[in-house]
C-alpha cells in the first residue's frame, strides 16, 4: 500500500482534472466521490487529504510515503523530504498586488513571509511585513497595508477587490515529494506510481 498526502482545495481540483486527462480514472473518481472523507483507498493507494501546508509535514514524519503539494509551500521553509518530480498542473505564480494608484510600499500583508521578504530584499526595498493567514486582499482594501504578496492564478479575486497585479515574483507548480525512508522501503511502489504518470504524460 502506498499512502499519498494530497493538498485539499485548488490543487486537488487541478490534480483531478489532470488525472481525468490522462485517464487515471480509478484515482480521479475516488477523489471526486470523497464527500467529507479525509482518508480514501483505491487499489494499492491510500490518500490522506490535508491542508496544503501540512502535506510536507505528513510526508516528513513518515505518515505519508509521498505527497502532492504546491511549490509555494516548499519554498517557504525547508522540509526533510525528497523533491522528486515537477507535476504538469497547478500552475500559478507569486505576485505583488495593490490598488492601481499605489507606487510605494511600506507595509505588505502576506501569508508567505519568506517569499515576500526575499523578494523585497532582492529589490533593496525595506518593508514591514504583516503575516495574515487568509484573505490578504482585505488588508489592502481597507488600507491596513500598501500592498500584498499572494498567489495569483486567474486574477479574478484581485479584480473583484479593486486590486491589480504590480509585479510577478516567481512561478508555482505542483510537486511530488517523498519521505526519505519510504523512498527506499517502498521504492518499487513509488517508482511504479511515478512511471504510470510519466507514461500517461507521454501518451497525452
Swiss-Prot record:
Q: Where is it localised?
A: Cytoplasm
In terms of Pfam families, this protein maps to: HisG
EC number of the protein: 2.4.2.17
Which reaction(s) are listed as its catalytic activity?
1-(5-phospho-beta-D-ribosyl)-ATP + diphosphate = 5-phospho-alpha-D-ribose 1-diphosphate + ATP
Report the InterPro entries cross-referenced here: ATP_PRibTrfase_cat (IPR013820), ATP_PRibTrfase_HisG (IPR001348), ATP_PRibTrfase_HisG_short (IPR024893)
The record's keywords, sorted A to Z, are:
Amino-acid biosynthesis, ATP-binding, Cytoplasm, Glycosyltransferase, Histidine biosynthesis, Nucleotide-binding, Transferase
In what pathway does it function? Answer: Amino-acid biosynthesis; L-histidine biosynthesis; L-histidine from 5-phospho-alpha-D-ribose 1-diphosphate: step 1/9
Q: Give the family this protein belongs to, as stated in its UniProt record.
A: Belongs to the ATP phosphoribosyltransferase family. Short subfamily.
Q: What does this protein do?
A: Catalyzes the condensation of ATP and 5-phosphoribose 1-diphosphate to form N'-(5'-phosphoribosyl)-ATP (PR-ATP). Has a crucial role in the pathway because the rate of histidine biosynthesis seems to be controlled primarily by regulation of HisG enzymatic activity.
Domain comment text? Answer: Lacks the C-terminal regulatory region which is replaced by HisZ.
The record's subunit annotation is: Heteromultimer composed of HisG and HisZ subunits.
Name the record gives this protein: ATP phosphoribosyltransferase
Please report the organism this UniProt entry assigns to the protein: Staphylococcus aureus (strain bovine RF122 / ET3-1)
Amino acid at each position: 500500500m502506498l499512502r499519498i498526502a494530497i493538498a485539499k482545495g485548488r490543487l486537488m481540483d487541478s490534480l483531478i482534472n489532470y488525472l481525468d486527462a490522462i485517464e487515471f480514472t480509478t484515482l480521479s473518481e475516488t477523489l471526486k466521490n470523497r464527500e467529507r472523507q479525509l482518508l480514501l483507498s483505491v487499489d494499492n493507494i491510500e490518500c490522506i487529504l490535508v491542508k496544503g501546508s501540512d502535506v510536507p509535514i505528513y510526508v516528513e514524519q513518515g505518515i505519508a510515503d509521498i505527497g502532492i503539494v504546491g511549490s509555494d509551500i516548499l519554498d517557504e521553509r525547508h522540509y526533510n523530504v525528497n523533491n522528486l518530480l515537477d507535476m504538469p498542473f497547478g500552475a500559478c505564480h507569486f505576485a505583488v498586488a495593490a490598488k492601481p494608484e499605489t507606487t510605494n510600499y511600506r507595509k505588505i500583508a502576506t501569508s508567505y513571509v519568506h517569499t515576500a521578504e526575499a523578494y523585497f530584499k532582492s529589490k533593496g526595498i525595506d518593508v514591514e511585513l504583516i503575516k495574515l493567514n487568509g484573505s490578504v486582499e482585505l488588508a489592502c482594501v481597507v488600507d491596513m497595508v500598501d500592498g500584498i504578496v499572494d498567489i495569483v492564478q486567474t486574477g479574478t479575486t484581485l479584480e473583484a477587490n479593486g486590486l491589480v497585479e504590480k509585479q510577478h515574483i516567481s512561478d508555482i507548480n505542483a510537486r511530488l515529494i517523498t519521505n526519505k525512508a519510504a523512498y527506499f522501503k517502498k521504492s518499487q511502489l513509488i517508482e511504479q506510481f511515478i512511471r504510470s504518470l510519466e507514461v500517461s504524460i507521454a501518451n497525452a
